[in-house]
């Protein structure tokens, strides 16, 4: 059995991780990839239920992991529950190409272990403050792809997008950053291109 590529999606609470999952699934599917999703929450399956209700994926292809601890534990120190969920999906769907693993909302230090994922994305948003890239949390520094989401809110919260772009370039000189408004779809084409290329998914961008 060839295992699917596992892609992690992490970031603070409310940054847009679940929206990113809901946005990526149809684009990856349109590129001819067979996709499944694992969500992580502390004591509920709220995010999994949301993804199932979204209509972008067969509900059977969505599994929930209830971590019962700090979210980063299940994606870094002890990923066994997520690995078990990934194995279940691989066995259930023999054609599976990609599994998106969404972490529970965490802080700027959240990272994925390479035992769990092949590639990972870190999501922040402008409403949390334009100084976030300058603070250089380890998640922001180490992620394969950084997504700065909710650029539509920047003017409303006084966030300086030009400064954020400069600070991201300083913090991540050789790693890509994409600025998005996932609600409207702004930046989605570039994000998908970066993901498909970076994770070596071997398909064209739809």
From Swiss-Prot:
GO terms for biological process: urea catabolic process. It holds the Pfam family cobW. One of its GO terms (molecular function) is nickel cation binding. SUPFAM superfamilies: P-loop containing nucleoside triphosphate hydrolases. Signal peptide: none annotated. One of its GO terms (cellular component) is cytoplasm. Belongs to the SIMIBI class G3E GTPase family. UreG subfamily. Homodimer. UreD, UreF and UreG form a complex that acts as a GTP-hydrolysis-dependent molecular chaperone, activating the urease apoprotein by helping to assemble the nickel containing metallocenter of UreC. The UreE protein probably delivers the nickel. This is Urease accessory protein UreG. The gene is ureG.
